[in-house]
């Protein structure tokens, strides 16, 4: 057996009737439609998975920022608590000599933790970060401003993105004072 006998068919092609072109076209169309449908289904499933992953990352990021701000507040409280016992004998000595001056010293000790609190920028504030993210994703600024107005948010915040977010600092203090924690948040959304 030589190589040419392997490539030649054993059937005489002149005796075989031609294949119907219409039937061939229909077969290829069905094949292409099924492949397209399978690829679309796969793409839709992967898009859903990516959206869920992005949402879980966003919630994890928000929780992380809340925990960091809470921990930053706790570490400052620990420092002030550590500083208070070391200065307690001094306050007692001052209290014996002059009661009004001890009140002044205590007030200055309380003011120091407020000076060292970490501030979150407006663009990093979880309440406003979605608007800055929309701008990064290519949404027109006019559309973002309209959404902010519809949600009752001041649109001038977009211009002040690098300024510290004062409402965030106040809300984090409110959480600490009320005893609420981030453990009350759940992923059951």
Swiss-Prot record:
* Residues forming coiled coils: 35-74
Q: Where is this region: Disordered?
A: 76-101, 150-189
Q: What does UniProt say on post-translational modification here?
A: Phosphorylated. Phosphorylation on Thr-182 may promote DHIC complex dissociation and consequently the activation of heat-shock transcription factor hsf-1. Phosphorylation is modulated by the Insulin/IGF-1-like signaling (IIS) mediated pathway.
InterPro entries assigned? WASHC3
What keywords sit in the KW lines?
Coiled coil, Phosphoprotein
- Judging by the UniProt lineage, the source's domain of life is Eukaryota
Where is composition skewed (Basic and acidic residues) in this entry?
Answer: 150-165
Q: Which family does it belong to?
A: Belongs to the CCDC53 family.
Name of protein: WASH complex subunit homolog 3
What gene is this protein a product of? ddl-1
């Amino acid at each position: 057996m030589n190589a040419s006998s392997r490539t030649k068919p054993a059937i005489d092609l002149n005796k075989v009737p031609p294949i119907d072109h219409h039937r061939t076209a229909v077969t290829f169309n069905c094949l292409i439609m099924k492949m397209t449908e399978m690829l679309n289904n796969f793409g839709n499933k992967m898009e859903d998975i990516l959206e869920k992953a992005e949402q879980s990352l966003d919630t994890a990021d928000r929780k992380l920022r809340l925990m960091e701000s809470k921990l930053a507040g706790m570490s400052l409280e620990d420092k002030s608590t550590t500083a208070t016992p070391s200065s307690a004998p001094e306050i007692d000595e001052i209290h014996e000599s002059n009661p009004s001056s001890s009140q002044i010293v205590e007030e200055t000790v309380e003011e120091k933790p407020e000076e060292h609190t970490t501030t979150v920028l407006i663009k990093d504030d979880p309440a406003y970060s979605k608007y800055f993210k929309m701008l990064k994703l290519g949404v027109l600024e006019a559309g973002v401003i309209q959404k902010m107005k519809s949600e009752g948010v001041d649109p001038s915040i977009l211009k002040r993105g690098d300024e510290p977010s004062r409402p965030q600092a106040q809300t984090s203090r409110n959480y600490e004072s009320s005893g609420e924690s981030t453990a009350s948040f759940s992923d059951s959304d």
